[in-house]
Amino acid sequence: MARYLGPKLKLSRREGTDLFLKSGVRAIDSKCKIDTAPGQHGARKPRLSDYGSQLREKQKVRRIYGILERQFRNYYKEANRLKGNTGENLLVLLEGRLDNVVYRMGFAATRAEARQLVSHKAIVVNGRVVNIPSFQVSVNDVVAIREKSKKQARIKASLELAEQREKPTWLEVDSAKMEGVFKRVPERSDLSADINEHLIVELYSK
């Protein structure tokens, strides 16, 4: 399945919630009917079956993190293999992706922009360039903007924007140095309550 390149707002309207795919503290302003399906008049949303609800939740999370179907399924398999709660393990793996950490640290306004920074070799982990967005960041890893990329206006703008967002407690960021430390693995209580990972587990358990 190819990566979606169309309007970001359309995806948020499809899922009925703000997926934070656009730059800004909130991706969608008050004039946009987020609870209305895409289309000129907004298609009426049918009542979902259990399977439909599970599928929608999986699609929502996959789109939030910008992950293709096969890769998302592999994350689920890895989460299921690990000890503990499979759903929580899945979210922890997704949060540990380098592109997500770059976004969470405020170096990019969106995860898509963070993925681009990583792919363009603007990010270093423990002093070494890493250009793989799915790279798993470990506890105590230092993630920073590469020296020659620090003058990019979009990075500075993103850091200013990040000051308006709630700062993740599992990360420690030095905005002046443009670097941060992955202090600990996030707990479920640290992450979005708008995600129902149990529905995803039910979907893949069938």
Curated annotation (Swiss-Prot):
Signal peptide: none annotated. It holds the Pfam family S4. It comes from the Bacteria. GO terms for molecular function: rRNA binding; structural constituent of ribosome. GO terms for biological process: ribosomal small subunit biogenesis; translation. Residues 96-156 form the S4 RNA-binding domain. One of its GO terms (cellular component) is small ribosomal subunit. Keywords: Ribonucleoprotein, Ribosomal protein, RNA-binding, rRNA-binding. The keyword Phosphoprotein does not apply. The keyword Ribosomal protein applies. SUPFAM superfamilies: Alpha-L RNA-binding motif. Belongs to the universal ribosomal protein uS4 family. One of the primary rRNA binding proteins, it binds directly to 16S rRNA where it nucleates assembly of the body of the 30S subunit. Part of the 30S ribosomal subunit. Contacts protein S5. The interaction surface between S4 and S5 is involved in control of translational fidelity. This is Small ribosomal subunit protein uS4. It comes from Haemophilus influenzae (strain PittEE). The gene is rpsD.
